[in-house]
Amino acid sequence: MVDTPYRKMLAAKIHRATVTGADVNYEGSLTVPPELLVAAKIHPYESLHVWNVTRGTRLETYAIEGLPNSNDVCANGAAAHLIRPGDHVILAAYAMVPEADAATHKPRLIFVDDNNQLSHVGPEIAGPNLRSDSDDTHLVRSTEMTPDGQPLAEGC
């Protein structure tokens, strides 16, 4: 039997969700609207990396499904010490991808507005004022805005 090498790759990302609540007394996790979990193809109880854009903190927890149409993104348990209401966060889930598939692997990337409504599904912004072109092999200049309407930063 031959061991298949795997790479840990980004599987899904919810970009710039707005935190609506934090409850240090809850047992743990991050509450996410079910509509966003489905759009991102993230399962309840799946491991989540949470990157707090506002505070610069990072943590790992798991997703739990919030109430339908609630738009609530809530930090629960110990995470509530690092994430506060009003913070913008990026939620990321990873998967082990066979080495043979790594070069063509495409994660599911969703972008939300300040009300945690799905804005669009699309390509990763490659860097300030850059984006991947249609075949993802070249970088081209972009005048795009961030999902919340802010201009992309100049330079790196």
UniProtKB/Swiss-Prot annotation:
It catalyses: L-aspartate + H(+) = beta-alanine + CO2. Its cofactor is pyruvate. The modification Pyruvic acid (Ser) is found at S29. Its main location: cytoplasm. It is found in: Cytoplasm. The active site is at S29, Y62. It is an enzyme of class 4 (lyase). InterPro entries: Asp_de-COase-like_dom_sf (IPR009010), Asp_decarbox (IPR003190). Its EC number is 4.1.1.11. GO terms for molecular function: aspartate 1-decarboxylase activity. Substrate binds at T61, G77, A78, A79. Keywords: Autocatalytic cleavage, Cytoplasm, Decarboxylase, Lyase, Pantothenate biosynthesis, Pyruvate, Schiff base, Zymogen. GO terms for cellular component: cytosol. Is synthesized initially as an inactive proenzyme, which is activated by self-cleavage at a specific serine bond to produce a beta-subunit with a hydroxyl group at its C-terminus and an alpha-subunit with a pyruvoyl group at its N-terminus. One of its GO terms (biological process) is alanine biosynthetic process. Heterooctamer of four alpha and four beta subunits. Catalyzes the pyruvoyl-dependent decarboxylation of aspartate to produce beta-alanine. Belongs to the PanD family. This is Aspartate 1-decarboxylase. It comes from Rhodopirellula baltica (strain DSM 10527 / NCIMB 13988 / SH1).
